Amino acid sequence: MYKLKIDAWPINEVPTPKVCMSDSIFKRKARKHQSDFRWRVLHCGHNPNHRIGQYGSYLLWEDAVLGKNFYTPYWPKIKHAIENRYPNSKQYELTPIYANMLRSEHIPFNFFVPMMDDFDAAAKVFDELIEENAIAKIIDIKIEYAPEKQYALNDGTSFDTFVLYQHIDGSIGGIGIEIKYTEAGYQLKRGSKEEKDILQGKTSNILTSLVAVTTIKTVCHPY
């Protein structure tokens, strides 16, 4: 856990980043929170001349490549997971996930890479989340997994994280997780195709043999 080292950092000299006028009230608070965290806890500066960095919630690249946007005790494993997921990506393509503290792309790696070390403990966590004593074991956890088109969901989308597990009755289940931070969340509109698919019990081709599919939509607040 990070600890605020007040005596070791000049908190009275916090640079004041520019205010992004297009931010919502929540996003403005989240941006300030992350900017303060960057300075007071991570001890990292920002680039006042950068198009995004001027607002304070964007890491300098030299800090970003050290994993400052991630859970640092697991940074080597998280870095390995990111490189495996995006093996052919250029630096500019990975910059948002490494440097942007307001996006949600880095959050699944922070949450679920540590879980991959202990599937037994992970099974207990997910059992509690779905409020059932149903998970015998976790089989796999896939972050930002995009299956082939024929195996995608009916609306062509996929999940930020997919957890494959064995039910206590021996059948196979899946938990789909969509994570949001400052991005707008998904609203299930009455009468929409998504609502009808859920009510009619439709699933994608890859999930037709699965006994249970639970979608967990998590909003990660900054406080």
Name these PLM-found stretches.
Residues 156-166:
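Short acidic loop-to-beta-strand element that houses the catalytic metal-binding Asp/Glu
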Residues 164-176:
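Active-site beta-strand-loop-beta-strand hairpin of nuclease catalytic cores
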Residues 116-120, 166, 181, 185:
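Hydrophobic/aromatic-lined pockets within catalytic cores
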Residues 1-151:
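Nuclease-adjacent, charged terminal/linker segments that flank catalytic cores
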Residues 102, 106, 110, 153-157, ...:
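Short, well-structured alpha-helical interface segments that form or flank functional binding sites
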Residues 146-150, 168, 180-184:
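Short, solvent-exposed loop/turn segments at secondary-structure junctions
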Residues 125-129, 178-180, 189-196:
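"Short basic amphipathic alpha-helical interaction patches in structured regions
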Residues 185-223:
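Acidic, metal/cofactor-coordinating or nucleic-acid-engaging core segments within structured domains
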